[in-house]
A protein has these predicted regions:
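Structured mid-to-C-terminal alpha-helical surface segments
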Residues: 1-160
């Protein structure tokens, strides 16, 4: 599914946001969690709980995506979750979910291989620039610094 929206930064540019879903995975690795959710409605704050996937599972599948494709948003999402998320994340739990999904596919990923893939991604101008038009102007993001951080705090936990 693709959404189109006008760029705020470049008024004559249309941005396309592709929403992807993996429909072959039917059962989550971790238990579904309930999360508080609130939104304004008619000058009141409505509060409820919604069910969703555990953050570590979502980041594990995001990590798998970065391993299997070249999209800068995957690095951004991992970096942002590790550094800015209001929900604390445990890098070891992310790795466990990542390895679970690779095992289901019959695939393995060692530390050196994944770091090599990320290093190659970071040499690609498109990979390093695809998030910029989507970010608010007050958000500073450096893909090279993000890559260094993700390697040190996440990928270094992978088996050798």
């Amino acid at each position: 599914m693709t959404y189109s929206a006008r760029s705020i930064i470049e008024p004559n540019r249309t941005l396309e946001i592709v929403v992807e879903a993996n429909v072959t995975e039917r059962k989550p690795h971790r238990a579904v969690v309930e999360m508080p959710f609130s939104f304004p409605f008619r000058d009141k704050a409505v509060q409820t709980h919604i069910k969703g996937f555990d953050i570590h599972e979502m980041l594990g599948t995001k990590m798998r995506a970065m391993f299997q494709r070249k999209r800068g948003r995957d690095l951004f999402d991992l970096y942002w979750a590790l550094t800015k998320s209001p929900t604390p994340v445990d890098p070891a739990a992310i790795i466990a979910s990542f390895e679970h999904y690779l095992k289901q596919e019959g695939t393995k990923a060692g530390r050196a291989e994944f770091i090599g893939i990320l290093d190659n991604h970071l040499k690609d101008r498109g990979f390093c620039s695809d998030m910029q038009p989507l970010l608010r102007t007050d958000i500073a993001y450096d893909p090279q610094a993000a890559g260094k951080y993700v390697k040190a705090h996440l990928l270094n936990l992978l088996p050798a």
